Amino acid sequence: MTPTHAASLVRELSQPLVSGAFLAARDRERLLEVLPRATGETLDAFAAAAVAVRRARIGDAASLCAIVSAKSGRCGENCAFCAQSGHYATNAPQHPLLPPPRIVAAAAAMARRGVTRFGVVASGKALPDEELESVATALTGIARLPMAADASLGVLSEDALARLKAAGLAAYHHNLETSRAFYPSICTSRAFEDNLEVLRACRRSGIPVCSGGLFGMGESWADRADLALTLLEAGVFSVPVNFLSPIAGTPLADRPVLSRDEARRIVVL
């Protein structure tokens, strides 16, 4: 297939997406056959199609979010990419949970700079009850500012999510990271299903979910497509697209950095 023919195919098959429909399975497969090798004119066609879909669905507006590392390091999980894992020797900062006033002060500083969403992020699989209460107090303070109060605190129960929602939580962040099939290559201390259940629990609790993945860990294009479809089925409202920055001391320290074109292909997907 010539680049011109491929670009024409992309424009043709992407039209249903612009109008709000979903692609038929066969059309999706045809695009996924072309995307991994797309360059030049073909990749530009994919990018233009992605922009058209975005404009049709959510327009051109952008929001600015920021986070605070409220608790850092000493994590018991063994995620192969993470400098905060206690399983690996890295130079990641380590500190216990910040007190609520410091978290709120960090949020206020960001609000003055035009940030409209602020996330409280903590290392570890889940927070103990007393720390959860501290975060709830901080979220209440953040919610009083002209910004949305978000959090990323690991695997939480519906009761814990309800407590945070009552305190002012606007949305919850919990990445799936990769496909179900590739996940055991990246993490064995937590099941993929546990992560998926967090997304379900948020939906049952009426909490919008922000969930995406990390790319460049050695996953295949089939893994990337599977993750995208899983996130679609989970009904997430925002999908963070992260690219691996290999960190010395972690199992993925020697992974090559993704090329610019490969990063563009992933964003298009």
Residue ranges and their predicted role:
Residues 1-77, 81:
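Flexible, acidic/Gly-rich N-terminal and inter-domain linker regions that tether
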Residues 232-239, 243-269:
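Radical SAM enzyme [4Fe-4S]-AdoMet core and its adjacent flexible, acidic
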Residues 40, 157-158, 221:
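Structural motif corresponding to alpha-helix initiation and N-cap regions
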Residues 39-45, 226-238:
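Zinc-dependent deaminase catalytic domain
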